Regions:
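Loop/turn elements at helix/coil->beta-strand transitions in domains of secreted/extracellular proteins
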Residues: 4, 133, 176-179
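Glycine-rich, aromatic-bearing surface loops/beta-hairpins
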Residues: 212-232
């Protein structure tokens, strides 16, 4: 990994930590509220309220699709009144399903607008929006801009939600269901960098990174498939 790379994510205990490396993750993430008996369901719905998927994760949360085009994402839309499940959303499920929605969204594919463009920043922002909708945080976790802009913000400490960690810690956090982000800053300001989220939940079985970018590298891919070791 070059000096221009980094790993970032939501730090829910931001006041206790400070960015100390190019890597970050959700420190002390309390969002993995999974019912050990696995008998209660999170619902994921389309924009019209039609059921897309049940996930047996112990929560009674309802996430609904909102936005259009590159901005299509899930947001918490309350809790199922007919369920005795936890009133805490399971963020592992939310991140997992948003990553899958990104990959299914034709607007996020390379050249969707006819300019050979890629949409890694919007895909990552969609995951951030999903998480942001489901947590009670004073400062929004969504980071705007292109990939280079997002990487600069994440590494600067300007957004107090993010904590810098090693790659191995970012990976472990994602394995535990937390939000971890990898970014690459292109040293040529006229060219794009790259940013992506670590796979969580069942997505990990498909690949370490949930990557949106050039078509040949879009999908659940190894880290080196998302951010090549030989980048300048």
């Amino acid at each position: 990994m070059s000096d221009g790379g980094g790993f970032t994510g939501v730090d829910l205990l931001a006041e206790k930590y400070y960015s100390i490396s190019p890597y970050a993750y959700c420190a002390g993430d309390p969002l993995n509220n999974v019912d050990p008996d696995g008998r209660l369901l999170t619902d994921f719905e389309d924009g019209d309220g039609n059921l897309v998927k049940h996930i047996d994760d112990g929560s009674s949360a309802v996430f609904q699709q909102t936005g259009t085009g590159v901005n299509l994402h899930y947001e918490l839309n309350g809790y199922n009144p007919n369920s005795d499940g936890s009133k805490s959303p399971n963020l592992t499920s939310a991140i997992q399903e948003q990553q899958q929605l990104n990959l299914q969204n034709p607007a996020l594919q390379q050249n969707a607008e006819g300019y050979n463009e890629t949409h890694c920043n919007q895909a990552t922002q969609n995951v951030m929006k999903t998480v942001d909708s489901a947590i009670d945080n004073k400062t929004p976790i969504v980071v705007n801009g292109r990939a280079n802009d997002m990487a600069a913000t994440l590494s600067s400490g300007k957004n107090p939600n993010y904590l810098s960690v090693s790659e191995s810690t970012a990976s472990k956090n994602a394995q535990n269901g937390g939000l971890s982000i990898v970014d690459y800053t292109n040293p040529n300001p006229s060219k794009s960098g790259h940013i992506a989220t670590y796979s969580v939940g069942v997505n990990i079985l498909e690949g370490k990174i949930a990557n949106i970018g050039p078509s040949s590298y879009t999908g659940f891919v190894p880290l080196n498939g998302a951010i090549g070791k030989n980048k300048p």
